[in-house]
Curated annotation (Swiss-Prot):
Residues 1-18 form the signal peptide. Residues 127-137 are annotated as: Framework-4. SMART domains: IG, IGv. It comes from the Eukaryota. Residues 19-48 are annotated as: Framework-1. Gene3D superfamilies: Immunoglobulins. Residues 85-116 are annotated as: Framework-3. This is Ig heavy chain V region MOPC 315. It comes from Mus musculus (Mouse). One of its GO terms (biological process) is immunoglobulin mediated immune response.
């Protein structure tokens, strides 16, 4: 996980990014037991042309957790610890992909990032800026 954190810092340095841009959007606040839906809009590259399109979250205290991906061909992979709660889908016409997380609790409070990687070896080539989610009643 330390390697993942370091790679995140390296890829986040201004000037390293290319013309591919990712932008997350979401509700900001969700009540416990509700579902969370987030959107990642990709510009500069078609999500059907290549890459794994991932969702990752960073908890308060900076721990990172990979949630899952949707591949360019539409196939999925998920973190086994969240497999029953998480779903990642896409809209190819809008060049967007989505995260749905069911039955949220306060433990799901985090900053959520979308990211693209070419080889799925825990190095993420492109990152969004992140969207903060708070779970609170």
């Amino acid at each position: 996980m330390k390697v993942l954190s370091l790679l995140y810092l390296l890829t986040a340095i201004p000037g390293i990014m290319s013309d591919v841009q990712l932008q997350e959007s979401g509700p900001g606040l969700v009540k416990p037991s509700q579902s969370l839906s987030l959107t990642c809009s990709v510009t500069g590259y078609s999500i059907t042309s290549g890459y794994f399109w991932n969702w990752i979250r960073q908890f308060p205290g900076n721990k990172l957790e990979w949630l899952g991906f949707i591949k360019y061909d539409g196939s999925n992979g998920y973190n086994p610890s969240l497999k029953n709660r998480v779903s990642i889908t896409r809209d190819t016409s809008e060049n967007q992909f989505f995260l749905k997380l069911n039955s949220v609790t306060t433990e799901d409070t985090a900053t959520y990032y979308c990211a693209g990687d070419n080889d799925h070896l825990y190095y993420f080539d492109y990152w969004g800026q992140g969207t903060t989610l708070t779970v609170s009643s």
